[in-house]
């Protein structure tokens, strides 16, 4: 039987001793019932936990509204990530964002790869500057904007198309030049870093690069990103 890889985003108690698991895969979101998964001694318990990557098999159900996860193998339980309370809370918020966004994304494969990259990078933190781990969720939030169809413009001034544009306008949806900037825009040296995090390919956003990013830039870029989500998606992060 062919196994499907996915990451469990959310679980809900179902009937007396079962769960509904909401799982992100490269093909989208699956809602599956896992029988006897509330029983600590059940073989189904380990592979039906939130924030767990699993390989699993599905059986179509004729009686229930949900298909059934009949077997599973834990690929990664992200133990290192779960040990730290602050990190876990950070990821919990990220999981909620991905869960709310997934039905509005067309490229599920890219979303899955992005989420998988983020969890793996944080769980196996290889950064010398450990505090910079906060940049990984920021990378996901920035790249998710593109997948949701509201990505900011970094290719020249959003107003006049000039190439020399180093400020960011939330109102205009991208970078602006010195001639088009307003008092409401962000003129900061960190816009270039924001562009790298947004446009950079995942295989290029390696620990060596993340180590070099000034920690002070995080607060500025996160503020811009959060306000951007609120304006264009009505999502308050």
For each feature predicted by the language model, list its residue ranges.
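Non-catalytic alpha-helical scaffolds and adjoining flexible linkers that form interface surfaces
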Residues: 1-19, 24-237
């Amino acid at each position: 039987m062919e196994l499907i890889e996915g990451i469990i985003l959310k679980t809900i108690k179902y009937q007396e001793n079962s769960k509904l698991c909401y799982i992100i895969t490269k093909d989208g979101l699956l809602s599956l019932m896992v029988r006897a998964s509330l029983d600590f001694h059940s073989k189904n318990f380990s592979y039906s936990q939130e924030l767990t990557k699993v390989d699993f098999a599905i059986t179509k159900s004729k009686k229930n509204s949900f298909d059934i996860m009949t077997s599973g193998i834990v690929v990664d339980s992200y133990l290192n990530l779960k040990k730290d309370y602050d990190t876990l809370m950070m990821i919990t918020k990220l999981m909620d964002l991905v869960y709310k966004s997934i039905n509005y994304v067309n490229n599920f494969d890219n979303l899955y790869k992005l989420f998988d990259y983020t969890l793996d990078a944080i769980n196996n933190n290889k950064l010398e500057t450990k505090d910079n781990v906060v940049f990984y969720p920021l990378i996901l939030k920035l790249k998710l904007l593109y997948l949701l169809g509201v990505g900011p413009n970094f290719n020249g001034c959003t107003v006049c198309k000039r190439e020399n544009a180093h400020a960011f306008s939330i109102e205009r949806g991208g970078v602006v030049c010195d001639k088009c900037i307003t008092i409401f825009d962000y003129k900061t040296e960190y816009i270039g870093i924001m562009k790298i995090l947004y446009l950079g390919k995942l295989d290029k956003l390696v620990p060596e690069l993340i180590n070099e990013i000034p920690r002070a830039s995080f607060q500025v870029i996160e503020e811009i990103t959060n306000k951007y989500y609120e304006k264009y998606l009505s999502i308050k992060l």
